[in-house]
């Protein structure tokens, strides 16, 4: 039995209870830090448990069960819906909406790995924390983008597997990620886990 990250609050005692209930895998919620995940895993001495963390897509912690608009086909995300009041504001909003739609149209044509949430740079830390499985979110994504996400995650895992421990710590892993996944361009800076928390 796999326990969804949508269960919300997770702590050492909760993991112990779920282990006693026969849960085989704990999926950590996006809001947990790598440090917290490590502490929980170490505290329960969980030899028979598997642990899963988010690796790509959907940075927002409310995207799953806690989003009131995601599963409604008739409307988009409420947090991305524009609102306006008076006539002057309406004119400004129309210009903003037009520009936003133009930018979104351009962005839809440009694939960027992890543009809605990424933890590829945190893979060595997730591994060291005891994470045994990774979650790649696919809901709401284009099939072509999902295929590229899968290839990129596999490539990142290949880089990680090929690196020696010392090289990961000196940043060689990040350099290779930038070259192989991001083609030398900067990443989207949409880190699921705070980039400074595990340094």
Placement of each model-derived feature along the sequence:
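Active-site pocket-lining/capping segments in soluble small-molecule metabolic enzymes
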Residues: 1-9, 13, 21, 27-199
